């Protein structure tokens, strides 16, 4: 469960809310005066929050939990607050906000900073840093990190234990690399990035040419001469891999969010603020537009162009361009196995049934 602040560090609700990043948010309290405001030590779900925690309601399916939650305060939409007032419901201080999920996110950021301090700057004695590497002020380099020739680490960046920063690579200011992140040579990460453990950026793209001089069916390697460029405010999940370009660079735009275990092949371009869920595979030279969302385990073929504002449902196989914004789904619905077998048998006969139907129409 989330870590609670020590009792002596608990904050009055209005003081806590005044201390968060309120950009783009407008909120007010339902409590009549400051004397009624609880002191807050943490944040939790409606079902798990205690009487010293704040919670939130952003999904209507959990609205019935408002009646049973022990939370000291709950973030709700204006409609929910009005409905509770009309019903005469009481018992909780309400934080009324048009965007409760975003306000919850800002509170979670505050509690993370309060409960998980970054630790002091400095280079661990076991780290190996090439003399030509540049490390700006307030950088923290963890145990057994390797920073190769010509690499640069920007101000305030933090490298967890065992990270490898290849020759000529750059890590932007205030970025966080969790333990065992690997940046090959020529990988450039922007500011305020978060890269989770096991991620590998800049490995060779999958490039081979048929070469009969090496033997029947043999393949000759095509050196991958491009780089990887990651924008600002990007998050990359654990064990995600982003290959370097063959000639042009592989590019991840500003604000992109990549979940765990995603494969981004060489020369792919991902537009700003696109979010991609776990286990997605993106084949080489595909371009994905801005503000797209791609559901988990989807597969995108190579050399495709995906428009801006496209939403791809989980498990979809995309094999052709998508030129228009909207939601796209290519998933065969699950069913009981016996029913699925019957439906699959019918699908296998569709071409035959189509021919027979056309023959009947001609009669």
From Swiss-Prot:
It catalyses: a UDP-3-O-[(3R)-3-hydroxyacyl]-alpha-D-glucosamine + a (3R)-hydroxyacyl-[ACP] = a UDP-2-N,3-O-bis[(3R)-3-hydroxyacyl]-alpha-D-glucosamine + holo-[ACP] + H(+). The keyword Transferase applies. The keyword Lipid biosynthesis applies. Gene3D superfamilies: Hexapeptide repeat proteins (2.160.10.10), MurE/MurF, N-terminal domain (3.40.1390.10). It comes from the Bacteria. Pathway: Bacterial outer membrane biogenesis; LPS lipid A biosynthesis. One of its GO terms (molecular function) is N-acyltransferase activity. Its EC number is 2.3.1.191. The active site is at residue 266. Belongs to the transferase hexapeptide repeat family. LpxD subfamily. Homotrimer. This is UDP-3-O-acylglucosamine N-acyltransferase. It comes from Bordetella pertussis (strain Tohama I / ATCC BAA-589 / NCTC 13251).
């Amino acid at each position: 469960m989330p870590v609670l602040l020590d009792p002596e560090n608990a904050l009055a609700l209005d003081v806590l809310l005044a201390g968060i990043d309120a950009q783009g948010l407008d909120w007010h309290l339902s409590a009549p005066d400051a004397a009624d405001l609880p002191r807050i030590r943490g944040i939790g779900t409606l079902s798990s929050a205690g009487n010293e925690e704040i919670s939130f309601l952003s999904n209507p399916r959990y609205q019935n939990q408002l009646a049973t939650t022990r939370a000291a305060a709950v973030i709700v939409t204006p409609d929910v607050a009005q409905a509770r007032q009309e019903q005469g419901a009481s018992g909780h201080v309400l934080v009324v906000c048009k965007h409760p999920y975003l306000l919850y996110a800002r509170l979670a950021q505050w509690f993370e900073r309060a409960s998980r301090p970054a630790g002091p700057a400095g280079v661990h004695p076991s780290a190996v840093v090439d003399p030509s590497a540049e490390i700006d002020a307030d950088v923290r380099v963890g145990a057994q990190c390797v920073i190769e020739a010509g690499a640069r680490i920007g101000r305030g960046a933090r490298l967890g234990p065992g990270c490898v920063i290849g020759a000529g690579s750059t890590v932007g200011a205030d970025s966080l690399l969790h333990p065992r992140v690997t940046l090959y040579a020529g990988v450039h990460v922007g500011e305020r990035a978060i890269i989770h453990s096991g991620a590998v950026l800049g490995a060779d793209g999958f490039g081979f040419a048929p070469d009969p001089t090496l033997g029947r069916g043999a393949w000759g390697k095509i050196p991958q001469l491009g780089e990887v460029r990651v924008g600002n405010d990007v998050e990359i999940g654990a064990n995600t891999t982003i290959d370097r370009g063959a000639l042009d660079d592989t590019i991840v735009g500003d604000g992109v969010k990549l979940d765990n275990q995603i494969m981004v092949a060489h020369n792919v371009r991902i537009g700003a603020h696109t979010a991609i869920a776990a286990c997605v595979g993106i084949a080489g030279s595909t371009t994905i537009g801005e503000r797209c969302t791609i559901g988990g385990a989807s597969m995108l073929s190579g050399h495709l162009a995906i428009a801006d504002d496209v939403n791809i449902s989980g498990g979809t196989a995309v094999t052709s361009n998508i030129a228009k914004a909207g939601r796209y789904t290519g998933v065969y619905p699950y069913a009981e196995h016996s029913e699925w077998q019957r439906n699959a048998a019918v699908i296998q006969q569709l071409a035959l049934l189509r021919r027979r139907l056309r023959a009947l129409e001609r009669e």
